[in-house]
């Protein structure tokens, strides 16, 4: 049995400005950093074997903030004095497994555009927007990869709003529009 803590990255500058980020790296704003720090505090005593993140920077940044207390505690147990002084973000990122399977949806020509100005009807979307079927395929591949790579482990994975909906859609065998949107830095638990 795998316990998966599925997390959405913290708020970014583009989230706050309602800009479609898609598969751009992104960077947390001050609110996003505070959100990730709050998750880190709440999850500090939880047992986590593996930290996984989308390979987009906003998720990696969120995951690094959440992982820090765990990695510092691990170093302290190994006898490293004042572990926090030695852990840079790069040190932490080296301990996080990254994957493109949980990248955000590829929004094609919509990437970088102001979200309220975009057409709502998918029939009016450009052909280069990633389909829901393709996203659900990536989501299924992600869940399969976790089962093979990390059986019987507790995993914290940081992804994005829509790919996290796709993961839950596959997991619960429900349509994506039946899955509630995750807030920035929200955590949901799935048992695989």
Please name every model-derived segment.
Residues 4, 153-161:
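Generic beta-sheet signal
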Residues 53-54, 137, 158-159:
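Short beta-strand scaffold positions
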Residues 16-19, 63, 108-112, 170:
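Short aromatic-enriched loop/helix-cap "lid" or pocket-rim segments at secondary-structure transitions
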């Amino acid at each position: 049995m795998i316990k998966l803590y599925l997390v959405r990255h913290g708020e970014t500058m583009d989230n706050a400005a309602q800009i479609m980020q898609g598969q751009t790296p992104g960077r947390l704003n001050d609110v996003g950093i505070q959100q990730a720090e709050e998750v880190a505090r709440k999850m500090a005593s939880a047992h986590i074997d593996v930290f996984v993140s989308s390979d987009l920077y906003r998720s990696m940044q969120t995951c690094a903030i959440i992982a820090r207390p765990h990695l510092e505690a691990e170093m302290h147990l190994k006898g490293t004095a004042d572990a926090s002084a030695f852990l840079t973000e790069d040190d932490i990122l080296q301990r996080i497994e990254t994957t493109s399977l949980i990248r955000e949806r590829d929004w094609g020509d919509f990437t970088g555009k102001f979200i309220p100005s975009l057409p709502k009807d998918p029939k009016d979307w450009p052909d280069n927007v990633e389909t829901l079927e393709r996203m659900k395929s990536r989501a299924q591949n992600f869940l399969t990869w976790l089962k093979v790579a990390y059986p019987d482990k507790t995993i914290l994975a940081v992804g994005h709003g829509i790919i996290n909906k796709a993961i839950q859609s596959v997991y619960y065998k429900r349509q994506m529009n039946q899955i509630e949107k995750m807030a920035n830095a929200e955590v949901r638990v799935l048992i695989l």
